[in-house]
């Protein structure tokens, strides 16, 4: 069984002479030689005989499971090192990618970690690049398709609340529409689910289901707004909109963005006179489209919308506990880091001295969202000087401030040269006006929900049929119910733009009960109606 001891000095840069900067490209732009080297490097780190910080098992295990520290067998704490729902989300994952890229470059010194451009037209139309969905590459197992566990993981928190994320040695990571639950109370149902898929669909059809799921999330609700303009909404819209969020604290995570939007939100009172204050845009954090893509690949059931046709899908990307064991995780996060890099460039914040946080704001405390990570006490204020454990640089603890000056990083990004529609070739303009009516959904307590979940917003059309118009996803951990350290920080509030409606129509439809919100969880995939819904604007 894997050790629970932390890796105390995990260096994120190569020692010795100044290294050549890695140039991170779109994976669709790699030539055959570059792709060959990438595959060979991934095979090298996934070699079951490899141990220590160059082993994929240990690299993947830094994010979530196998848990360590207080979170090893105590659900009051988070046993993974990763940060979500706080200001360290972008920088911790930046350090994490550097650690993985360092290991890959030991296998092949000129290899770089590519990004999967989730914003381009090719992804919106066809889904995941083929290199991630083909079982073999040139006659050998493809290391980007799946990972086979070299050791077992035991979920010591399995009895609380109701899910077991233990994984046996030899387990192969899976994606939607498969289920990867292996606990003693789940494995029979998961095997029945997976056997049904294998008996009724071939590999091409299974890949088609996954790609359909991904494209549905990206393309949901492509509207003609009240000004006659085409608006690409939901995940693809969020990817662009997050770059316009100016304040780092708000941009960095969902917890801070929820509070910021709450402060700007003004209800549209039926029959009342609306405020004359200048309209402002809804703040979309970087973490929001990130969450959507995790759930798109992992699977969450939302009836009536082409997001999940098969109840019971539990792909590894769908929960923080095991997401990092799926190789696609790193290409997804490389895209998220490129968005972060682009945001820094757009807002002229390419040096650490140019970025500050809102002190003691929601999203700046260790108990926000997931709970304290190993080495950080409960109710600790987070800053840009908070150590990003377990990462080190020349023996010194890595902090956010050490990773915010772009010219000092050991890598650069190259914009995509093939395809169309990429956000990196068509960066949105700052001060872009966007002020549709906003649906505010509140009263969601994550303490009672095991795992990730989604809120689906539907609108009754002229035939009386409900049509799903928006989804807000929450990437979570299985055992959040037991997090006594973060019980008062588990309230989720969502803000969803209603692009098709003007303010009067939004008020009327809300008053006539034509706008509905349902909460879809693992335990209740059919959805539960949420009543705490308000229509308003951002002022």
UniProtKB/Swiss-Prot annotation:
It is an enzyme of class 1 (oxidoreductase). Binds 2 copper ions per subunit. Activated by acidifying treatment at pH 3.0. Its EC number is 1.14.18.1. Pfam families: Tyrosinase (PF00264). The N-terminus is blocked. Its cofactor is Cu(2+). Cu cation B binds at residues 290, 294, 333. The keyword Endoplasmic reticulum does not apply. Cu cation A binds at residues 63, 84, 93. Keywords: Copper, Melanin biosynthesis, Metal-binding, Monooxygenase, Oxidoreductase, Thioether bond. GO terms for molecular function: metal ion binding; tyrosinase activity. Belongs to the tyrosinase family. This is Tyrosinase. It comes from Aspergillus oryzae (strain ATCC 42149 / RIB 40) (Yellow koji mold). The gene is melO.
């Amino acid at each position: 069984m894997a050790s629970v001891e932390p890796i105390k000095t995990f260096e994120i840069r190569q020692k010795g002479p100044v290294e050549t900067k890695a140039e991170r490209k779109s994976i669709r732009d790699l030539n055959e030689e570059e792709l060959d080297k990438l595959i060979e490097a991934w095979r090298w780190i996934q070699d079951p005989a490899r141990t220590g910080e160059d082993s994929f098992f240990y690299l993947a295990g830094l994010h979530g499971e196998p848990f360590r520290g207080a979170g090893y067998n105590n659900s009051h704490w988070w046993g993974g090192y990763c940060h979500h729902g706080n200001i360290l989300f972008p920088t911790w994952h930046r350090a994490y990618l550097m650690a993985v890229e360092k290991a890959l470059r030991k296998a092949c010194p000129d290899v770089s970690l590519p990004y999967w451009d989730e914003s381009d037209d090719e992804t919106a139309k066809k889904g995941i690049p083929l290199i991630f969905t083909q079982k073999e590459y040139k006659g050998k197992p493809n290391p980007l398709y799946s990972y086979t566990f070299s050791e077992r993981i035991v979920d010591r928190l399995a009895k609380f609340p109701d899910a077991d994320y233990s994984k046996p040695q030899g387990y192969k990571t899976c994606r939607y529409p498969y289920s990867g639950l292996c606990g003693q109370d789940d494995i029979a149902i998961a095997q029945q689910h997976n056997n049904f898929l294998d008996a009724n669909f071939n590999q091409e059809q299974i890949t088609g289901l996954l790609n359909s799921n991904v494209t549905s999330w990206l393309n949901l609700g492509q509207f003609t707004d009240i000004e006659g303009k085409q608006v690409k909404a939901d995940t693809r819209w969020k990817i662009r909109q997050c770059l316009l969020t100016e304040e780092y604290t708000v941009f960095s995570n969902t917890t801070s963005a929820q509070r910021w939007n709450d402060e700007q939100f003004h209800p549209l009172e039926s029959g009342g006179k609306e405020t004359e204050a200048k309209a402002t845009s809804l703040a979309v954090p970087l973490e929001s489209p990130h969450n959507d893509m995790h759930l798109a690949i992992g699977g969450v059931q939302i009836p009536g919308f082409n997001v999940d046709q098969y109840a019971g899908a539990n792909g590894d990307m769908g929960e923080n506990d095991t997401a990092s064991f799926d190789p696609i995780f790193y290409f997804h996060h490389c895209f998220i880091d490129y968005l972060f890099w682009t945001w820094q460039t757009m807002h002229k914040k390419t040096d650490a001295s140019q970025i500050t946080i809102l002190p003691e704001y929601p999203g700046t405390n260790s108990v926000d969202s997931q709970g304290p990570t190993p080495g950080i006490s409960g109710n600790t204020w987070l800053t840009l000087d908070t150590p990003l454990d377990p990462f080190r640089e020349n023996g010194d603890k890595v902090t956010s401030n050490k990773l915010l000056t772009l010219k000092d990083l050991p890598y650069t990004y190259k914009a995509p040269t093939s395809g169309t529609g990429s956000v990196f070739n068509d960066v949105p303009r700052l001060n872009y006006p966007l002020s549709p009516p906003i649906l505010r959904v509140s009263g969601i307590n994550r303490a009672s929900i095991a795992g990730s979940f989604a809120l689906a917003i539907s609108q009754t059309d002229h035939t009386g049929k409900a049509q799903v118009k928006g989804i807000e996803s929450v990437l979570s951990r299985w055992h959040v119910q037991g997090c006594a350290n973060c019980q008062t920080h588990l309230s989720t509030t969502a803000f969803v733009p209603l692009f098709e409606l003007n303010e009067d129509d939004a008020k009327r439809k809300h008053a006539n009960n034509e706008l509905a919100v349902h909460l879809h969880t693992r335990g209740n995939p059919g959805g539960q109606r949420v009543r705490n819904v308000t229509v308003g604007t951002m002022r």
